[in-house]
UniProtKB/Swiss-Prot annotation:
Residues 1-34, 75-84, 124-189 are cytoplasmic. It holds the Pfam family TB2_DP1_HVA22. GO terms for biological process: endoplasmic reticulum membrane organization. This is Receptor expression-enhancing protein 5. The chain crosses the membrane at residues 35-51, 54-74, 85-103, 106-123. Keywords: Endoplasmic reticulum, Membrane, Sarcoplasmic reticulum, Transmembrane, Transmembrane helix. Residues 52-53, 104-105 are lumenal. It is a multi-pass membrane protein. The keyword Nucleotidyltransferase does not apply.
Length: 189
């Protein structure tokens, strides 16, 4: 690990949060430097993602759990920059999930797939301005969206109109059925 990365990693491990508090307690009880403990945990998780049962679930929990928590905090904060950062992550996560749905049957057979997927998701949620989600959104998703926006808007409008027509027709039929049922009930009494 380069000196700059090691220093940044150590700074990250000394920030105040529940995980670093737990690391501090472990460090105090064992006498082992918290960076070694963290690297050990990372190594165990990586091994589990390669060989463990339920690696898919663990990977999805990592890709969903922390971002969901931070997204809720971002919604509750007055700052809107963090909202944009996490909305970008969720757009990329959604696109990735759809692509993965069609390719997962093949990819899940590769031994390092879930470890690589987890690394990809961690890269997408990295706390830096040029993280994976930002990069993929700006270079791939946004240009594609802008190119096809009017067509997608048209399809969405058509679907919305058809859904409204269907809901109105079902409501109308339900009202008729209710009136008929009540009318038959009055006749029988």
């Amino acid at each position: 690990m380069s000196a700059a990365m090691r220093e940044r990693f150590d700074r990250f491990l000394h920030e105040k949060n529940c995980m670093t508090d737990l690391l501090a307690k472990l460090e105090a009880k064992t006498g082992v430097n918290r960076s070694f403990i963290a690297l050990g945990v990372i190594g165990l998780v990586a091994l589990y993602l390669v060989f463990g049962y339920g690696a898919s679930l663990l990977c999805n929990l990592i890709g969903f759990g922390y971002p969901a928590y931070i997204s809720i905090k971002a919604i509750e904060s007055p700052n809107k920059e963090d909202d944009t950062q996490w909305l970008t992550y969720w757009v990329v996560y959604g696109v990735f999930s759809i692509a993965e749905f069609f390719s997962d049957i093949f990819l899940s057979w590769f031994p390092f797939y879930y470890m690589l997927k987890c690394g990809f998701l961690l890269w997408c949620m990295a706390p830096s301005p040029s993280n994976g989600a930002e990069l993929l959104y700006k270079r791939i998703i946004r240009p594609f969206f802008l190119k096809h926006e009017s067509q997608v808007d048209s399809v969405v409008k058509d679907l919305k109109d058809k859904a409204k027509e269907t809901a109105d027709a079902i409501t109308k039929e339900a009202k008729k059925a209710t009136v008929n049922l009540l009318g038959e009930e009055k006749k029988s009494t």
